[in-house]
Amino acid sequence: MFLLYEYDIFWAFLIISSLIPILAFLISGILAPISKGPEKLSSYESGIEPMGDAWLQFRIRYYMFALVFVVFDVETVFLYPWAMSFDVLGVSVFIEALIFVLILIVGLVYAWRKGALEWS
């Protein structure tokens, strides 16, 4: 028998955790002073008069490093629970995790061969 009342705490937490930021934005939008002028449209430079354009063009290698970092950061998120329950799960899950790591190693070798990890 599926009992929905067991999830009451979850739904209460979800509603409260959604309402707090929404209310914070609404209250600050209502109570905050609105002033329009040229100072509001300029970029803030720690009290120094801004010089030049605020838009900078980043080189693509920053994005490649960030992408490789995110891939291996997500790998850590997936492998940590597996490592904590390794003795309970058995050999089949070990083989699946090994395949997962091998696929990531292939991706790392591909990025390395394409020059995504070179900083020159």
UniProtKB/Swiss-Prot annotation:
Compartment(s): Plastid, Chloroplast thylakoid membrane
Protein name according to UniProt: NAD(P)H-quinone oxidoreductase subunit 3, chloroplastic
Entries under HAMAP family matching the protein: NDH1_NuoA
Gene Ontology cellular component list: chloroplast thylakoid membrane; NADH dehydrogenase complex
Organism: Lupinus luteus (European yellow lupine)
Pfam families: Oxidored_q4
Role according to the record: NDH shuttles electrons from NAD(P)H:plastoquinone, via FMN and iron-sulfur (Fe-S) centers, to quinones in the photosynthetic chain and possibly in a chloroplast respiratory chain. The immediate electron acceptor for the enzyme in this species is believed to be plastoquinone. Couples the redox reaction to proton translocation, and thus conserves the redox energy in a proton gradient.
Protein family membership: Belongs to the complex I subunit 3 family.
